[in-house]
């Protein structure tokens, strides 16, 4: 191999993005089982007098940051709906879709919702759902009573940039809170990396 080719190879390695589930500081995958975050720590919420909407990005890079039970619950959710996820992605011609767990909560009687109204804004581009996989029969009715909820998996054309900022919108309701979560995620990555070097995984948790 020529010196020019070696130089190009080194440059390419230096510019490579961290793999899924990697710590930017460590440059290697973070292990599972050391995280302490909950689903609520990763949730974005928007709402009004009719509805509250919760959005949880289901991204492999976030899984090592979650407490064991929370991570296992979300992985089971994805695994049990893998066939439907793959079908939606295949029809859309998308190899690696972004996935979010979306829950609608009724705040009054006969609260109606439109699943297609929810969007995310990534780098000034609006992404509407490629497909919606209902997780409850109530979701298809698009109507909720007080304290009732309906959930679904939302698939998007691009991976959700969980290491950067993005916006969640439902009509005129918007959340920019993900950017404010980034310091928490960075601290948890550092904590997980440190714990993994000094503590064995507690398989009984």
Where is each model-derived feature located?
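Conserved functional micro-motifs across diverse proteins
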Residues: 20-205
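Bacterial N-terminal signal peptides
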Residues: 6-16
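Positively charged n-region of N-terminal signal peptides that target proteins for export
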Residues: 1-5
């Amino acid at each position: 191999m020529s010196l020019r080719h070696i130089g190009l190879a080194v440059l390419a390695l230096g510019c490579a993005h961290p793999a899924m589930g990697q710590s930017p500081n460590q440059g290697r995958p973070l292990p599972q089982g050391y995280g302490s975050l909950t689903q609520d720590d990763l949730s974005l919420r928007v709402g009004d007098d009719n509805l509250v909407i919760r959005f949880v990005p289901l991204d492999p890079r976030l899984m090592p940051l979650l407490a064991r039970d929370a991570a296992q619950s979300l992985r089971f959710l994805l695994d049990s709906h893998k066939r439907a996820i793959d079908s939606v992605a295949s029809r859309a011609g998308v190899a690696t879709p972004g996935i979010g767990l979306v829950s609608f909560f009724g705040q009054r009687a006969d609260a109606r919702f439109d699943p297609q109204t929810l969007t995310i804004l990534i780098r000034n581009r609006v992404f509407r759902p490629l497909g919606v996989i209902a997780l409850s029969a109530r979701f298809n009715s698009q109507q909720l009573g007080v304290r009732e909820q309906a959930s679904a998996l939302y698939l998007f054309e691009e991976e959700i940039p969980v290491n950067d900022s993005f916006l969640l919108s439902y009509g005129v309701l918007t959340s920019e809170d993900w950017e404010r979560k980034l310091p928490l995620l960075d601290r948890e990555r550092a904590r997980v990396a440190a714990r993994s070097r000094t503590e064995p995984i507690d398989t009984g948790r």
